[in-house]
Amino acid sequence: MFTPEDLDLFAEKGIDVHTVEEQLVSFKSGFPFLRILSSASVGNGILSLDEQQTQYYLDLWEGYLKDNHKVVKIVPASGAASRMFKDLFAFLSADYSEPQTDFEKKFFNSIEHFAFYSDLDEACLKNEGRSITDLIESGNYKAVVSNLLEAKGLNYGSLPKGLLKFHRYATNNRTAMEEHLTEGALYAASSDGEVNIHFTVSHEHLADFKALVAKKKVDYERRYGVRYHISFSEQKPSTDTIAVDANNEPFRENGRPLFRPGGHGALIENLNDIDAEIIFVKNIDNVVPDRLKEPTVRFKKIIGGVLVSLQTEINRYITMLKSGKYTIDDLREMIQFLHKKLFVRNEETKHLEDAELALYLLRKLNRPIRVCGMVRNSGEPGGGPFIAYNQDGTTSLQIWESSQIDMSNPDAKEQFESGTHFNPVDLVCAVRDNKGEKYDLPKYVDKNTGFISLKSKNGRELKALELPGLWNGAMSDWSTVFVEVPAETFNPVKTVNDLLRPQHQ
């Protein structure tokens, strides 16, 4: 099936032939729907904290930072912002020249409220010889939009979200990336003022990100009294996946198999390369101005404290199990911990001998840990928290997307629709074992949880394979705890007009 040239291409990308063959099998067989026991809710998989607990975990996190542990905040930031401007691209190509839709009218009626307004005004003066106000008054709306989106102006239609100006301040306006620098200083700084932030970016924008850091870093260090260690990585070519045609044969372009990026699940490799004890993960577009940051900072510290508490308890159990110094009562206590704290159950454990039970417990406890914030549903999109079945017969907490659930099954559909919370992508992860050794994170991926989607390339249809999502199947075999966090901590920017919401003004 593969030519010598194909094999050279695989080697160049660092992809094993066996991996490509596995992907082709996945296209033919598809991915199974995932079985749900129930949606997670407060009291059934989601922890809701009272004021006393909240203060306890806040103090725990502050104490952890004082001990100078290595904490890194990682921000996936490679996606282009083009979808943010979908409606404005449509306006540019429309057969009318003045705003018609509600979206278009809102954009132009409030244009001076965008953080990029003064930059856009400069671009219009330079390229059109007229200000935004003059262009709008003369009905030349499309010139304003083309200066926003195209390379002759701000080029926002091709830049990633991290480089776009999101928020206005009295002295300067901030990009999404700068808001993450601020956040890092507020909840992830060690006692001696070290802040580690890692951005995953696309190769074409790496230089732009580095230039912005070089320009702004010292200002933020002075403002917050910290020292930033800012690093970048790109998705590895070895995580690209092969595309196929309608017959599930490799899709070829000029005779060469076409590979596509494997989606955010590929970032488990980047996460695996990070030298840290604890890693925060948060999307690039979920940021707010300083006046609204308090709930975000507070709950980041709280979920950090929950993680530290869990890890301490789990490490104590792992040490006992590895040493062999435990009683039957200790094993019962660990089973209760699995049931009540981690919502991991397996009916077969009641039939196990003590030695087998100890091995089972070690397998379930000695793995990476994540604590995930969950927000009450209010119509916002996002995957959901579930208690789900795993391949080994256990049930545990998982984050699944709607496409992974069989909506033709009435029970599964009801479980999905009865969900009270959604996943805002608000994670904190412990990635070392009780001896401080790093876990090898790709070992904990469930390969049966990928996605297949239909795409096109130069007018030809193809099927693309996405790897198990970073917070979905890529962390399927992690110890997981869900904590309820307030809706104020979730303020994503999906369209340019979202920047006009009060949360971004």
PLM regions with names:
Residues I279, Y389-P424, D433, T449-L454:
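C-terminal, active-site-flanking charged/polar segments
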Residues M1-V25:
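Intrinsically disordered, low-structural-confidence terminal and linker regions
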Residues L7-A11, V25, S29, I36-S378, ...:
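Domain-scale recognition of functional cores that engage charged ligands
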Residues S131-S138, K152, Y156, D285, ...:
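Conserved catalytic alpha/beta cores of large enzymes that bind or transform nucleotide phosphates
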